[in-house]
Amino acid sequence: MIYTLTRGSLLGSTCKLRYSSLFSYLSTAALRLGFENPTNGNPMDNSSHHIGYVNGFNGGEQSLGGFQQNSYEQSLNPVSGQNPTNRFYQNGYNRNQSYGEHSEIINQRNQNWQSSDGCSSYGTTGNGVPQENNTGGNHFQQDHSGHSSLDELDSICREGKVKKAVEIIKSWRNEGYVVDLPRLFWIAQLCGDAQALQEAKVVHEFITSSVGISDISAYNSIIEMYSGCGSVEDALTVFNSMPERNLETWCGVIRCFAKNGQGEDAIDTFSRFKQEGNKPDGEMFKEIFFACGVLGDMNEGLLHFESMYKEYGIIPCMEHYVSLVKMLAEPGYLDEALRFVESMEPNVDLWETLMNLSRVHGDLILGDRCQDMVEQLDASRLNKESKAGLVPVKSSDLVKEKLQRMAKGPNYGIRYMAAGDISRPENRELYMALKSLKEHMIEIGYVPLSKLALHDVDQESKDENLFNHNERFAFISTFLDTPARSLIRVMKNLRVCADCHNALKLMSKIVGRELISRDAKRFHHMKDGVCSCREYW
């Protein structure tokens, strides 16, 4: 599905004027604000645009509970060895804390967890392994002399074996031992990355039994974990049960909605946040731009960008500009995104983002043009895939895919299938069940989108090729093997095709089962023939 729109083709006259006025502002924004390209600066610079926070808050001046807050920096991810993108331990300018109650201190060499009573602190060593620093007070970790040691648990976590890690901490609890919070947060992150919902529920129980309801940071991590698992309902239950919330709490639930294809709910949550008298920060606006991109509502996003600096006095940083390029280009507004990038001072982040997204939408000419600009600005950004005209695969995506494979333990079955292969008896059974279901689909209006079958074959063969797509067999297999009315989950590492998207909606409606389908783009929540993406992904 390619969305390539002409410049301003979907904008009304009023919106065109607003759009033109906004670009006029942006064309000189970098110069007027004294903004510099962060790639040209000191990599250890702690200025607000470098760390992603704006409006003068960089966390370097604020003190809480006797500890000075550090600028927003993080240690290496214990699994990938790279800077983590999760938000479990962010502190920035105290976004994760309820003022005066809870303190987190993080820098590039260690991660410390400070309990609310200021008595016990936890951290990680340089290799990402949690360690305990006892200063009296509460202890969440006891000496353990069972079959598995803490070192073994850390090793299992580093290998991404989520199920095994959860089994170990469950067995320890049965023996009367409790795992410390840093390790629980670590495992929670792994559950979210691996989309291991059942294990996530166990970790949720462990965390809540270790902290009080007032520990906002812990509950924020649970929301983020459920967001990664695609369980909006569980994340929302946690959110609604919290007596107190901070900026990161609201940010997390907005991100959860957007990440799961529910952009309108994300915008509604943002409106509720403001109605309750809260003031957003620069980080929250990035989530709003993401939600508007999910909705494909460029005008809504531009209005929020306008309000960011006019109503709240937040000075845009490069991360905001990159978010705007994504908001415009991901729905297919490539001409508008190009105009936006051209209005700014040349910046490799903007051109690289547009290069990748234009190639995703099949605009190879624009992609090559952006590649030339990236090469001029910083040739080191181009890897082998980029130079070949492909969209580079992020190392973080490879790590997550590895975690998802490792999350499958002994209680998971594996079916070997190829398109159209019914040589195995179990595959033949699935094929016949799916064929029967297809007849019901046709009765309620299903028409195969044969244009998506690219092989040069006759019409019947094209329809059959679409019929044999693997996610349909995954659906029918899960339907036959699970209890009635239970939720069906289908995870895929490729973008779902439009025909399968239509088919899965109808299949879900016919069998009366809610379906959560995860493709390379986003989560699709399907129920009663309607998808949360609203036919846009």
UniProtKB/Swiss-Prot annotation:
Q: Does the keyword rRNA processing apply?
A: no
Q: Residue spans with biased composition (Polar residues)?
A: 113-140
* Gene Ontology annotations of biological process type: RNA modification
Transport among keywords? no
User: Could you tell me which residues belong to the region Type DYW motif?
Assistant: 443-537
Per the record, which residues fall in region Disordered? 113-148
> Listed GO molecular functions?
RNA binding; zinc ion binding
Compartments where located: Mitochondrion
Family under the similarity heading:
Belongs to the PPR family. PCMP-H subfamily.
Q: What is this protein called?
A: Pentatricopeptide repeat-containing protein At4g32450, mitochondrial
